[in-house]
Amino acid sequence: MFLAQEIIRKKRNGLALSSEEIQFFVQGITTNSVSEGQIAALGMAVYFNDMNMDERIALTTAMRDSGTVLNWQSLGLNGPVIDKHSTGGVGDVISLMLGPMAAACGGYVPMISGRGLGHTGGTLDKFDAIPGYQTEPSSELFRKVVKDVGVAIIGQTGDLVPADKRFYSIRDNTATVESISLITASILSKKLACNLDALAMDVKVGSGAFMPTYEASEELARSIAAVANGAGTKTTALLTDMNQVLASCAGNAVEVKEAIDFLTGAYRNPRLYEVTMGLCAEMLLLGGLASNEADARAKLNRVLDNGRAAELFGKMVSGLGGPVDFVENYSKYLPQSQIIRPVFADMQGYAYSMDTRELGLAVVTLGGGRRKPGDALDYSVGLTQVCALGDKVDSSTPIAVIHAQSEAAFAEAELAVKKAIHIGETAPEKTPEIYAYIRASDL
């Protein structure tokens, strides 16, 4: 038997907690036998004194086990259960292509995603733009679609990781969100509750990333890779670039359109393609579905080119309540804004740098993101044809096209976009889409 205040005192004094102490405290978070003040105090103690890797693994697994842990054995799946998670960015539509692509190569992808908050878009918000799509299906329907289609992308159910829900809301109100130990446990407890065989982790770097510096992003990526592998899930973390919008657009319906164009081959943004392939290939390798990276990429290109990945996206949409002909006729179903108009730079030159966070906030201002949890969204608004760094721009080449519902909203977004995309006389040096892979062998 432990006392919550003694556990707090121990961490306050900079000592390591045992896995039993951590389990006791997390159980108290779940059962409400630990008070909000005690949770806040432990959060602050961890923020200042950190946790070693054993403590992080213990915290992650205790939070994972605080609710239901999914079990796939009874379904008799004939392939690995694999997934990816992103720390979030702007124009990060990867999940919509990656899930069906991995499923088409023999994996099973039970992806539990989130909604957008702040400047980053949420995968669930994109699916909410599709009429009828259930982001909160029954567990029976979720399991059925995973088994029959190979991929289902839904929201977190109430019985998964209840400890994280309570802990996170208290951290949010007490300025302890930025602790890498606590971020690691929060992210991974939700993913590991899906009982995955393998996970590819996408940690963003740059002006639109969650972490402020490359060093902080790398520290988080290393922590996630070490803890996930330590908890028994094969995991690789990729450090990927978010110094510019990843897709050619940012929003909800506009990103769904880009995802379908990518899957059908109508248009594939080269940067988006590179990061999607990098993450998806890693999932296949970790899941034993490919012998090396070249083999993985060949398999992925095959399911893109033969239409199998697009077909599975359509089956997932219809399986979860959306239209059966969505892939073929998406323009009939996706909402469109009143005003669709280009924005031009005030000078000619090259797109030199981008405040990606500000572009994400421009989408929020248009109504496509939340200022606070629970806000209703306008799924039609956003940005399309966003220029890439190094693109030449002039009075006839727009830096973006704004989708807005009113002249006032357009004018506000136009100012924000012009301010966020900096034009230079020369093109900037090209940066890689993927900076680094952090595999178990690198830890």
Swiss-Prot record:
Enzyme Commission code(s) on record: 2.4.2.4
One Gene Ontology term from the biological process aspect of the record: thymidine metabolic process
Cystine pairings recorded for this chain: none
Residues passing through the membrane, by range: none
Keywords: Glycosyltransferase, Transferase
Gene Ontology MF term list: 1,4-alpha-oligoglucan phosphorylase activity; thymidine phosphorylase activity
A Pfam family that the UniProt record links to this protein: PYNP_C
InterPro entries (UniProt xref): Glycosyl_Trfase_fam3, Glycosyl_Trfase_fam3_N_dom, Glycosyl_Trfase_fam3_N_dom_sf, Nuc_phospho_transferase, PYNP-like_C_sf, PYNP_C, Pyrmidine_PPas_bac/euk, Pyrmidine_PPase_CS
The protein's annotated pathway: Pyrimidine metabolism; dTMP biosynthesis via salvage pathway; dTMP from thymine: step 1/2
GO CC, any one term: cytosol
Catalyzed chemical reaction(s): thymidine + phosphate = 2-deoxy-alpha-D-ribose 1-phosphate + thymine
NCBIfam families to which the protein is assigned, alphabetical: PRK05820.1, T_phosphoryl, Y_phosphoryl
HAMAP family noted in UniProt: Thymid_phosp
Family: Belongs to the thymidine/pyrimidine-nucleoside phosphorylase family.
Function as written in the Swiss-Prot or TrEMBL entry: The enzymes which catalyze the reversible phosphorolysis of pyrimidine nucleosides are involved in the degradation of these compounds and in their utilization as carbon and energy sources, or in the rescue of pyrimidine bases for nucleotide synthesis.
Subunit and interaction comment: Homodimer.
Protein name according to UniProt: Thymidine phosphorylase
Species this chain originates from: Shewanella baltica (strain OS223)
Gene name of the encoded protein: deoA
